[in-house]
Amino acid sequence: MYLYTSYGTYQFLNQIKLNHQERSLFQFSTNDSSIILEESEGKSILKHPSAYQVIDSTGEFNEHHFYSAIFVPTSEDHRQQLEKKLLLVDVPLRNFGGFKSYRLLKPTEGSTYKIYFGFANRTAYEDFKASDIFNENFSKDALSQYFGASGQHSSYFERYLYPIEDH
């Protein structure tokens, strides 16, 4: 399974979604634009998407949920260790109030992994983010040893994806 992402204006991305209703397309609002995500076993219908292989998942994507996309940079010599660490995280995410879905994504190009956490709303996510589970497994401090010394990669950061009707 692959997850493809592309950013643009609400109108442009919504037209893509309307023209391809047979596809698994999900549109969200960010602080400064809109984003469309496509989950697919094959090629994307998006023209120039960022492409990721889904290497771990729980739950289903839903446009009515709040998502946090965490961008985790790494270097070639740390990729396997980062991936192994994240795949070995064995935590009961479903036990967190409001939890809906999780995706661990490996880039098809580049060296920045993504982690998507889906929750019923931002408050439920913030509660999870304050937990020991998050801080010990997904925080910048927990993952910084896998970033590598190279300055060629991006930095660890989060981007919030809001349901269109809520933002």
Curated annotation (Swiss-Prot):
Down-expressed in ATCC 12228 compared with ATCC 35984. This is Signal transduction protein TRAP. Gene3D superfamilies: 3.30.70.100. Residues 66-157 form the ABM domain. It comes from Staphylococcus epidermidis (strain ATCC 12228 / FDA PCI 1200). Transmembrane segments: none annotated. The modification Phosphohistidine is found at H65, H78, H153. Keywords: Membrane, Phosphoprotein. It is found in: Membrane. Disulfide bonds: none annotated. InterPro entries: ABM_dom (IPR007138), Dimeric_a/b-barrel (IPR011008), Heme-degrading_MO (IPR050404). GO terms for cellular component: membrane. RIP inhibits TRAP phosphorylation. It comes from the Bacteria. Belongs to the TRAP family.
